[in-house]
Amino acid sequence: MLRSSQARSVVRSSQWATTARVHQLELPSGWKPSALGVAPWQQRQQRQLSVRSLDHLVITCHDMDKTIDFYTRLGMSVVQFGQGRKALEFGSQKINLHQKGKEFEPKALVPQPGSQDLCFVIHDSIADAQKHLQEHGIQVVEGPVKRTGAVGPILSIYVRDPDNNLIELSSYQDAK
């Protein structure tokens, strides 16, 4: 038995369905008048968004020059774009740099240097990476340790950038 609110809803739905047929209204794909009184604009087709890849991310730093120096010692390239903006490039990815207090809009709700934990896959062996880091005065804070990457086992070492972001350098080849 229908409650009065359900009965009103069915009547409204039936009236809407009749109006749609009489006026030949075209509904968006997947929408239909409902016998339960849910108007088409209230119906949501359950569709998944399909994210393809990561284009860029943003690191907020205290000192742009120190940050650029650190990441170029890891093999990244610095690029300028827009009006005085700087980014780090590697592979087909980019890290945009924002200086604390001079962030570009829109920005993170609380842009904070030192809050990142990033993992970079390297072409080199972990042993070669450790040697490179030592030659460039970058201290390994942990590792090598076995971890699980996005596509399987990895071997990783950890360092900290000038803002104390945790940077993981990983090799899939060394994990085999």
Swiss-Prot record:
Catalytic residues in the record: E168
Biological pathway: Secondary metabolite biosynthesis
Mutant phenotype after disruption: Does not affect the itaconic acid nor 2-hydroxyparaconate production.
Domain VOC: 53-172
Gene that encodes the chain: RDO1
Family matches, as Gene3D superfamilies: 2,3-Dihydroxybiphenyl 1,2-Dioxygenase, domain 1
Family membership: Belongs to the glyoxalase I family.
InterPro entries per the UniProt record, alphabetical: Glyas_Bleomycin-R_OHBP_Dase (IPR029068), Glyas_Fos-R_dOase_dom (IPR004360), GlyoxalaseI/FosfomycinResist (IPR050383), VOC (IPR037523)
Name under which the protein is recorded: Glyoxalase domain-containing protein RDO1
PANTHER family: GLYOXALASE DOMAIN-CONTAINING PROTEIN 5 (PTHR21366:SF14), GLYOXALASE FAMILY PROTEIN (PTHR21366)
Physiological role: Glyoxalase domain-containing protein; part of the gene cluster that mediates the biosynthesis of itaconic acid and 2-hydroxyparaconate. Cis-aconitate is secreted by the mitochondrial tricarboxylate transporter MTT1. In the cytosol cis-aconitate is converted into trans-aconitate via isomerization by the aconitate-delta-isomerase ADI1. Decarboxylation of trans-aconitate by the trans-aconitate decarboxylase TAD1 then leads then to the production of itaconic acid.
